[in-house]
Amino acid sequence: MSFVESWRFAGARRRRQVTPGPATRPGYSDYTQGDSWGEGEGDEDEGCDQVARDLRAEFSARASSETKRAPLLPRVGDGSPVLPDKRNGIFPATAAKRTQARRWPIQALSILCSLLFAVLLAFLLAIAYMIVKELHAENLKNEDDIHTGLLGFWSLLIISLTAGLSCCSFSWTVTYFDSFEPGMFPPTPLSPARFKKLTGHSFHMGYSMAILNGIVAALTVAWCLM
């Protein structure tokens, strides 16, 4: 055998050795297969890929359905869409329209109840005025030209206190429901001290005026009945 033939024979043998064959997984011992950190990594990767594909498909389907349902936005001169103002994750204009459409029966009912309450209050005040007028007119005049009232001290005190408490409670209730957050902001004089510390307010003119209205009403009724 010549040198050239021996070189060709060695090259062909080398090519046969490096020819790729079917890849086989190397065998591991029972210890490495059972207790190693890499056990089932291939299966887990395939499962994660499948979950990721499912999530992508779901998100794409949901996005396409939302774009079909969403109305077309108006466009400006350069062709870009005009996006509505978004505050705190919501669109205030759209949310306001929806809430107004849902709450108009409640608003109408509240207005009707307020009107009925005002009519009832006016009726009660008219009756109270008639009673006070009659009691004020019923005075006795004796022979010495001294006027003597029919009402005693305790009766006069009870009537005046009742009128004052009624006026005070009405003004207090109106101020309470007209506040930003009833009972907390602004706090009432009867609210706990921690509410006053949280809001930073310890004095509210509305509740003070309610108390003042009650005092003035009590004094007015007492003066009229004397």
From Swiss-Prot:
CC per GO annotation: nuclear inner membrane
Disulfide bond positions: none
Biased composition (Acidic residues): 38-48
Region (Disordered): 1-49
Domain of life: Eukaryota
UniProt signal peptide: none
A Pfam match: ARL6IP6
Modified sites of kind Phosphoserine: 2, 36, 60, 65, 80
InterPro entries hit by this protein: ARL6IP6
Topological type in the membrane: Multi-pass membrane protein
PANTHER family per the UniProt record, alphabetical: ADP-RIBOSYLATION FACTOR-LIKE PROTEIN 6-INTERACTING PROTEIN 6 (PTHR28640:SF1)
Protein name from the UniProt record: ADP-ribosylation factor-like protein 6-interacting protein 6
Species assigned in the record: Mus musculus
Gene: Arl6ip6
